[in-house]
């Protein structure tokens, strides 16, 4: 197969081995963090004594907070999530240490061990702070999807990803190893795959899974065969029905609330996919991911990848990353407190049980290590939170920008000083600042003094603060981890806990430095490599990459900022 990807230069092996020694130092955000009860920290697994597994199965559930895993634990299947919770090792206090917790940032961290301050993946999309031009995290106009339409700013390559991953290091040292990334979202497939892997993502226009010409000129036969079967069409007319009796959902918010959005399938169960449509087509395919069937379809493609690529079939370790996107779509529309989210989680658990049974039979229980985490958590829907007596709400971006511009006009003269938002940051009319003979930092500081007066805003940090060394101001270290000079906005704004930017009184989101968004599952299983137990010690998701590298007997990615996870000895 002719490959068209550009060459990705990795450091020489000896340099990488030397860099690996630096990964044992704790990151700045974990140093001094709350630790486990004295005497409860498990011994580090002696990975060097165990032969590397044939396959690493890296699972991501997009938008899954740990509170949902533990809150519904009593309703789980015996061998889905409970495989990790009852027979694996899992971390009760696993956090992201960066402040802007969104999908691309989370996926960029997991297998690189590097924060956005190093990777350059500061968000899903951002605007150039000098020109305001939009940039998507994995957009690259030089490449297109294979056999599918490529929209402007579609994710097609890891060009913007400035670091290497565990898979990149593995494939440099062992070219026969394979690194496959699969997801309902382009960013969920591309970023974990790194620069040397191969990514496949769901195409909402066709119901297919496709790669891009960054990776290959044409799909392998197994991908064509999967798509030829039109597996997405099987869900047309299928009913999403609750898995359990109504009484089992008493702990979650009922369907049909006024703040719950219509994801394309309504906001009540049971829901029939494709209702009111004549047949499968782009509109229908786009409604699959906001349902449990999006995960079912993604896992079906993952099985096809295991078969087609013969993953885990020889002594060259392979890595399969599968990012399941449906939970994020469902939480955005209905909220993590909703029955729809609760029920989707139970469907997902059943899918995982079937998936692991398949891997046990195909690869062998003693031949693979499984890891499951999330790219971020979720904030409860503000309207529901307020009904529970909590402080919560929405900050309308246009109103916040208008308020700040009015204040800056009074101070510096008429002008559209703030031209918009990039993530939760403000970007400015830089030529106007220069024309008026003003210093940038003077304008940024003035804007900060104004924006903190907006209802729902907790604080804001200027470029000078983010480039500084202050380690005492709350949330500053987290936002510094999310800030990349020349890419990120020069004024970063943080809403209060429970608040979010948004102009629609519907649905909810994530993206804050608070526990709801940063506290995620970190679950591991692998009988020959990992012991069992709940670990209380606080850890960060940046610790995953060095740990997986140790299991694989390869150096950690050279930009990794984490340390080895304190996994219990086997």
Q: Where on the chain are the PLM-derived regions?
A:
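Bacterial signal peptide processing site
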Residues: 21-23
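C-terminal motif of bacterial Sec signal peptides marking the signal peptidase cleavage site
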Residues: 16-19
